[in-house]
Amino acid sequence: MSPQTETKASVGFKAGVKEYKLTYYTPEYQTKDTDILAAFRVTPQPGVPPEEAGAAVAAESSTGTWTTVWTDGLTSLDRYKGRCYRIERVVGEKDQYIAYVAYPLDLFEEGSVTNMFTSIVGNVFGFKALRALRLEDLRIPPAYVKTFQGPPHGIQVERDKLNKYGRPLLGCTIKPKLGLSAKNYGRAVYECLRGGLDFTKDDENVNSQPFMRWRDRFLFCAEALYKAQAETGEIKGHYLNATAGTCEEMIKRAVFARELGVPIVMHDYLTGGFTANTSLAHYCRDNGLLLHIHRAMHAVIDRQKNHGIHFRVLAKALRMSGGDHIHSGTVVGKLEGERDITLGFVDLLRDDFVEQDRSRGIYFTQDWVSLPGVLPVASGGIHVWHMPALTEIFGDDSVLQFGGGTLGHPWGNAPGAVANRVALEACVKARNEGRDLAQEGNEIIREACKWSPELAAACEVWKEIVFNFAAVDVLDK
């Protein structure tokens, strides 16, 4: 017998496998203000008790492994282990439970969303004892929040930079998303901006392809927005997508955007990755650039109700990693988004303090302390008839983004932009006068059509376009 084995034997080490719940299920545990708290939707395999499943999640996402190891004796498990401290049965669902897990803050590197997710949603999601696992929510303690820079600038600073107050901002994604030359792309940008939009946008998959290299696109878009600014007297922006195959190339593109003097760049934060996103957010803070975030790939992760990560968690992670805008769904458009759930994570993006509210899917009270807020972006299948609902749902601190709803106007891009701006101004005016946008929305739009032929034409084109599909991800009953 080796000296090491003799030493461990003397303190009671016993090799073998024991149930996770004996170590990691601790219903008596009182959570600390510094703990990261997680709510998991757990679907155990047949025959696996919920307590064992919840404890397995806590173990495999913190200090545990499948067998007892002698090196456990070289550290303090009580200090570092995750703890499943509560389990609730999901009403109306067979064999589904919400397992609450507390993680000590010392498990995580400061200022790193990458490290946080590597632990909490790493290998545990492939664990055989679970049929499915979904991370529903996280509580990020103020002590950890303060290690992040967060959004480069935030809502108020953006409004001050743009000199735009008292209404939602208007945007448009240039279509077709792929295939235009840089010059034709810039022309479309110019027409939309001179028509009254605040922003135009690269689509998420516009990077640097053979038909339009990034440097050419940046130059023509900068020319377009400066020309539109000179004609309208308003500050304009175009989301120049800096996403690239390497972090070095991404930063190079952001540097060129700064040299052109444009106000905003863009990043695909899930496909690009949190490390790249945080790096770009830090560059934008240091160099006065706003940062628009697209959530391409999110539905692969968040759409299924029993497995993956809920978007409210991805939204919190983005606020920590850094971004001034993020796409959030529309409630009324073509993309998934149930109203109460959407409004729940919109508040988590914008507000400083959000109370627990299970009716909106918010499992934990979240205090963001001094972290700036993020503007939610409503985009996807929306048009002028949706304007009253969007204004009522999202309020002033939002970006309403009409791609096809601008470029599909029968008279062209600029009239499409005019129609959207007129519809927005009419809705804001009506709201400020005390009218009910939810009840009187269609009437408000029809009244505005009388003095805007561009809006009237848009209303005629899209009068019968609806997307009546039930949401897949809905609140538990």
UniProtKB/Swiss-Prot annotation:
GO terms for molecular function: magnesium ion binding; monooxygenase activity; ribulose-bisphosphate carboxylase activity. CDD domains: RuBisCO_large_I. Residues 1-2 form a propeptide. Mg(2+) binds at K201, D203, E204. It is an enzyme of class 4 (lyase). The modification N-acetylproline is found at P3. Its cofactor is Mg(2+). It catalyses: 2 (2R)-3-phosphoglycerate + 2 H(+) = D-ribulose 1,5-bisphosphate + CO2 + H2O; D-ribulose 1,5-bisphosphate + O2 = 2-phosphoglycolate + (2R)-3-phosphoglycerate + 2 H(+). GO terms for cellular component: chloroplast. GO terms for biological process: photorespiration; reductive pentose-phosphate cycle. Gene3D superfamilies: Ribulose bisphosphate carboxylase, large subunit, C-terminal domain (3.20.20.110), RuBisCO large subunit, N-terminal domain (3.30.70.150). It is found in: Plastid, Chloroplast. RuBisCO catalyzes two reactions: the carboxylation of D-ribulose 1,5-bisphosphate, the primary event in carbon dioxide fixation, as well as the oxidative fragmentation of the pentose substrate in the photorespiration process. Both reactions occur simultaneously and in competition at the same active site. This is Ribulose bisphosphate carboxylase large chain. It comes from Nicotiana tabacum. The gene is rbcL.
